[in-house]
A protein has these predicted regions:
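Negatively charged
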Residues: 1-174
């Protein structure tokens, strides 16, 4: 974890198929990275904290955690507003069950099979960007108990924490 990766822009497939890999990367500066596709795909033992990563420049997270069967870490604070490709992102990530309701997925055009086979994912995604998204959602929750809500989060909705000061009804109308 002492590597200086601050100038790296492409981390696609970096730990793909590294089945025993489970090292701490929490202090990595990934703020310049634009591609994280397949980064942890089939890294079946990986389950470390990435919550403080600055992923605001990333555009491609396709298959990022696909088949990362142990991964179940909080990613709720990630700024994914630049992401356009999220297809298969958590496909067959069989332990993943974190709340992503407040992700800004408004730029995403591909959510195809995003949670396909993510058998532990029991969340109802109810943030404004999820509800209003026009992305390709083919097979998004195939073989997964998760779903996208037909209405926007309120404080009483299980799994959806309303952010303080935000008025989701106004956001829907704007």
């Amino acid at each position: 974890s002492k590597w200086d990766v601050s100038a790296v822009t492409d981390m696609a497939s970096m730990f793909s198929r590294a089945s025993a890999f489970n090292q701490d990367l929490s202090k990595w500066d990934v703020s310049a990275v634009t591609k994280m596709a397949f980064m942890f795909a089939s890294a079946s033992a990986f389950n470390k904290d990435l919550s403080k990563w600055d992923v605001s420049a990333v555009t491609n997270m396709g298959s990022m955690f696909s088949r990362a069967s142990a991964f179940n870490q909080d990613l709720s604070k990630w700024d994914v507003s630049a992401v356009t490709a999220a297809g298969y992102m958590f496909s067959r990530a069989s332990s993943f069950n974190q709340d992503l309701s407040h992700w800004d997925v408004s730029a995403v055009t591909n959510m195809r099979s995003m949670f396909h086979g993510a058998s532990a994912f029991k969340r109802e995604l109810c943030g404004v960007a999820w509800v209003n998204s026009k992305a390709d959602k083919s097979d998004m929750f195939r073989d997964s108990p998760g779903s996208i809500s037909s209405t926007v989060c309120t404080t009483s909705r299980k799994g959806c924490d309303e952010r303080e000061g935000e008025d989701y009804e106004d956001a829907l109308l704007s």
